[in-house]
């Protein structure tokens, strides 16, 4: 679900210093729905 993508995005942002890579993964996640 999209909610899973949002949760994964927040976890990524919290644990990584590369927001760009997090948002790329987020958009790929949304496209897979």
UniProtKB/Swiss-Prot annotation:
Q: Which GO terms describe its biological process?
A: defense response to bacterium; defense response to fungus; killing of cells of another organism
Q: Where in the cell is it found?
A: Secreted
Processing after translation: Contains two disulfide bonds.
Protein name (Swiss-Prot/TrEMBL) = Dolabellanin-B2
Main subcellular location of this protein, as a coarse class: secreted
Question: Sorted alphabetically, which keywords does the UniProt record give?
Answer: Antibiotic, Antimicrobial, Disulfide bond, Fungicide, Secreted
Biological function: Has antibacterial activity against Gram-negative bacteria E.coli JM109 and DH5-alpha, H.influenza IID 983, and V.vulnificus RIMD 2219009. Has antibacterial activity against Gram-positive bacteria S.aureus IID 1677, B.subtilis RIMD 0225014 and L.monocytogenes VIU206. Possesses antifungal activity against S.cerevisiae A581A, S.pombe IFO 1628, C.albicans ATCC 36232 and TIMM-1623, and C.tropicalis TIMM-0313.
GO CC list = extracellular region
């Amino acid at each position: 679900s999209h909610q899973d993508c949002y949760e994964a995005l927040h976890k990524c942002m919290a644990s990584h210093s590369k927001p760009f890579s997090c948002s790329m993964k987020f958009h790929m996640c949304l496209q897979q729905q």
